[in-house]
UniProtKB/Swiss-Prot annotation:
Keywords: Acetylation, Allosteric enzyme, Carbohydrate metabolism, Disease variant, Glycogen metabolism, Glycogen storage disease, Glycosyltransferase, Nucleotide-binding, Phosphoprotein, Pyridoxal phosphate, Transferase. The keyword Nucleotide-binding applies. Phosphorylation of Ser-15 converts phosphorylase B (unphosphorylated) to phosphorylase A. It comes from Bos taurus (Bovine). This is Glycogen phosphorylase, muscle form. It catalyses: [(1->4)-alpha-D-glucosyl](n) + phosphate = [(1->4)-alpha-D-glucosyl](n-1) + alpha-D-glucose 1-phosphate. The modification N-acetylserine is found at residue 2. Coiled coil: none annotated. The lineage of its organism: Eukaryota, Metazoa, Chordata, Craniata, Vertebrata.
Length: 842
């Protein structure tokens, strides 16, 4: 017999997480048992916690498969326009809890595991993150898949099944160390290998010109084997597919030409082909022109396009003969969205298939390609833009280079016709960049070959039209759009912050989960004492829970009553973790100067990974840990200030830290962060934002009201003016005593007594070549932080401001973003209609 439930536990069954019916719980226990014994071949005497996790995962997966098969059958019969989201990154995180939430199984599973003497939360912690992304771009793709399924779109995510995802970060002596992320070591219960759909991908070789046109011959072949992962919509019985390709060597690999005794070597060399899907490149907002990376980009594109065309051609009447030989209808049945330029080779590859294999005239093929493809830009940083050396493409993809040259020739003819005599414009707009090394500008290729080009926040889309893509905007203004990013409220509220989701549902019902604009109804509760109390209580519980987690995992003590000041994102100069550091040191100096004065206690937490080859980013991590070593051990400071570096920041850690945050740091130099999505997660979870007018911060402040936002610093126009005038760090150093003191401490080795010049590179950069103008925003940032502390002293007013932020965060649902892509780019209509469940008649 299980113990009787307390009233509070009984009430928890009235929940956004769905009811636990008795039959359901019994059934789940039965299936759990079956999987433990028959799938995992274990009994309770030898089963490990991981076995129990797998048994639960397979049990939950059973509830997906009927819906998955039914959804795919439905698409086959109805033949809707299909959306293909191509991305080199999908930063999924964990799948178990998200699946339970979307299928309304969470309560029943909780009860079933409890009755079996297991703790579901402990089992959830065993799952490895699927870390197939670096940061925002990959996580956006994952949120988009969730929204596309929730909105009933016939959508597919296509990418690479990296054997090793983003590295695990270990901090040793204050320095970042990288460890391989062997996430598949124990197997992945959520994927289904589909070897029967394996496809060939060609590399190298040469082009033969025949009477029938160009032929790409003498190529090396690598096989692409697909692994499918189900993507469930929110309680609508839709389950879409994410298909990730894995590289396999063909069976005759290197055996055609092996010499006597070369058989063993030929088999060992299969690894070379299979290296294509071995590891994710760990660069965020930085282009590294490596051949293996170019192979990855073509690999995903070539396999995916074959799959798309196979699906387009196959009829819905079950006959194997291709029925559609005419490609006129292709853009009516297929939309391809390019997530940044990484899959840009889809454009020449589709042209190659249409012209060389399907024998379409160039003009017709080009019309089909442009109508099918659309391109999302994610950055304006010049070092992040992909510019592939011509000699690399020529070696690896000789036919594609010819096609790119032809595209360029015809494109420049159009430009010349539109702007006669403007030779410099031709040079600027060419897909081919002349120079010491000839390069292909992949963004230019994407704009020329797409019918829509979008930025990811209003300010970013404007910057594209006014600066890096100005010439293209003048030629084809109709192509340019904005689609402000969003986040899925299923993972980023219901799943990671059930306490908050619950008290919201008690006031306005549960419909907001799939219609986030309904959060506006909370504006009428901004003076409701019981709601104010509930919001503050949930936040305090989340802070206590996160404090306990830090203590358990990292043996760090923090004061849960302090202001939790959090900056978690990739470590990059443009994101200005250094500005945060300068504030922390300034606070420290103020406490030391007036030790008896009252200071609002703060725990500053900074987390994020640095690209392994990015020296400055690694120095920034070392600086944060060095500041922590001084501040956290100074008895004068006590628990008024703590500095914590959050090791190995990833999706599953974000889900823990974001609900506990009081203050969200979004402090990039205006004009550098395309959108940001972490900012939205904090807003939805009841943190206030301190930030510059950059990316989506601008629209968040507009929605919430600037008076409910801590805005500081230069605007884009100010940055431009300062660039024209010339940014001189020295003048800020000379003028601002507190800043000067901080920099002198860094220079003198105050934070690195054993190596006094440890931070000389950082000081030198800040003083002499700081592209991101940290000093220019220092004064306003410090003043703004004083306003933050002052408000935090008044908990009621703080919480009222939090409620206003939560209530106005509805715009930042990825459901809104995807509905706009659907209507304005893909030409399909989203729907919240349910599919019939597997046990219902259609």
């Amino acid at each position: 017999m299980s113990r009787p439930l307390t009233d509070q536990e009984k009430r928890k069954q009235i929940s956004v997480r769905g009811l636990a019916g008795v039959e359901n719980v019994t059934e789940l226990k039965k299936n759990f048992n079956r999987h433990l014994h028959f799938t995992l071949v274990k009994d309770r005497n030898v089963a490990t916690p991981r076995d129990y996790y797998f048994a639960l995962a397979y049990t939950v997966r059973d509830h997906l498969v009927g819906r998955w098969i039914r959804t795919q059958q439905h698409y086959y019969e109805k033949d809707p326009k299909r959306i293909y989201y191509l991305s080199l990154e999908f930063y999924i995180g964990r799948t178990l809890q998200n699946t339970m939430v979307n299928l309304a199984l969470e309560n029943a599973c909780d009860e079933a595991t409890y009755q079996l003497g297991l703790d579901m939360e402990e089992l959830e912690e065993i799952e490895e993150d699927a870390g197939l992304g670096n940061g925002g771009l990959g996580r956006l793709a994952a949120c988009f898949l969730d929204s596309m399924a929730t909105l009933g779109l016939a959508a597919y995510g296509y990418g690479i099944r990296y054997e090793f995802g983003i590295f695990n970060q270990k901090i040793s002596g204050g320095w970042q160390m990288e460890e391989a992320d062997d996430w598949l070591r124990y197997g992945n219960p959520w994927e289904k290998a589909r070897p029967e759909f394996t496809l060939p991908v060609h590399f190298y070789g040469r082009v033969e010109h025949t009477s029938q046109g160009a032929k790409w011959v003498d190529t090396q072949v690598v096989l692409a084997m697909p692994y499918d992962t189900p993507v469930p919509g929110y309680r609508n019985n839709v389950v879409n597919t994410m298909r990730l390709w894995s590289a396999k060597a063909p069976n005759d690999f290197n055996l055609k030409d092996f010499n006597v005794g070369g058989y063993i070597q030929a088999v060992l060399d299969r690894n070379l082909a299979e290296n294509i899907s071995r590891v994710l490149y760990p660069n965020d907002n930085f282009f590294e022109g490596k051949e293996l990376r170019l192979k990855q980009e073509y690999f995903v594109v070539a396999a995916t396009l074959q799959d798309i065309i196979r699906r387009f051609k196959s009829s819905k009447f079950g006959c194997l003969d291709p029925v559609r030989t005419n490609f006129d209808a292709f853009p009516d049945k297929v939309a391809i969205q390019l997530n940044d330029t990484h899959p840009s080779l889809a454009i020449p590859e589709l042209m190659r298939i249409l012209v060389d294999q399907e024998r379409l005239e160039w003009e017709k093929a080009w019309e089909v390609t442009v109508k099918t493809c659309a391109y999302t830009n994610h950055t304006v940083l010049p070092e992040a833009l992909e510019r592939w050396p011509v000699h690399l493409i020529e070696t690896l993809l000789p036919r594609h280079l010819q096609i790119i040259y032809e595209i360029n020739q015809r494109f420049l003819n159009r430009v010349a016709a539109a702007f006669p005599g403007d030779v410099d414009r031709l040079r600027r707009m060419s897909l081919v960049e002349e120079g010491a090394v000839k390069r292909i500008n992949m963004a230019h290729l994407c704009i020329a070959g797409s019918h829509a080009v979008n930025g990811v926040a209003r300010i970013h889309s404007e910057i594209l039209k006014k600066t890096i893509f100005k010439d293209f905007y003048e030629l084809e203004p109709h192509k340019f759009q904005n689609k402000t990013n969003g986040i899925t409220p299923r993972r980023w509220l219901v799943m990671c912050n059930p306490g908050l989701a619950e008290i919201i549902a008690e006031r306005i019902g549960e419909e907001y989960i799939a219609d986030l604009d309904q959060l506006r109804k909370l504006l009428s509760y901004v003076d409701d004492e019981s709601f104010i109390r509930d919001v503050a209580k949930v936040k305090q519980e989340n802070k206590l829970k996160f404090s306990a987690y830090l203590e358990k995992e990292y043996k760090v003590h923090i004061n849960p009553n302090s202001l939790f000041d959090i900056q978690v994102k990739r470590i990059h100069e443009y994101k200005r973790q250094l500005l945060n550091c300068l504030h922390v040191i300034t606070l420290y100096n103020r406490i030391k100067k007036e030790p008896n004065k009252f200071f609002v206690p703060r725990t500053v937490m900074i987390g994020g990974k640095a690209a392994p080859g990015y020296h400055m980013a690694k120095m920034i991590i070392k600086l944060i840990t060095a500041i922590g070593d001084v501040v956290n051990h100074d008895p004068v400071v006590g628990d008024r200030l703590r500095v914590i570096f959050l090791e190995n920041y990833r999706v599953s850690l974000a889900e823990k830290v974001i609900p506990a945050a009081d203050l969200s740091e979004q402090i990039s130099t205006a004009g550098t962060e395309a959108s940001g999505t972490g900012n939205m997660k904090f807003m939805l979870n009841g943190a206030l934002t301190i930030g510059t007018m950059d990316g989506a911060n601008v629209e968040m402040a507009e929605e919430a009201g600037e008076e409910n936002f801590f805005i500081f610093g230069m605007r884009v126009e100010d940055v431009e003016r300062l660039d024209q005038k010339g940014y001189n760090a020295q003048e800020y150093y000379d003028r601002i005593p507190e800043l000067r003191h901080v920099i002198d401490q860094l220079s003198s080795g105050f934070f690195s007594p054993k190596q006094p010049d440890l931070f000389k590179d950082i000081v030198n950069m800040l003083m002499h070549h700081d592209r991101f103008k940290v000093f220019a925003d220092y004064e306003e940032y410090i003043k703004c932080q004083e306003r933050v502390s002052a408000l935090y002293k008044n908990p009621r007013e703080w919480t009222r401001m939090v409620i206003r932020n939560i209530a106005t965060s509805g715009k930042f649902s990825s459901d809104r973003t995807i509905a706009q892509y659907a209507r304005e780019i893909w030409g399909v209509e989203p729907t919240r209609q349910r599919m019939p469940a597997p046990d219902e008649k259609i």
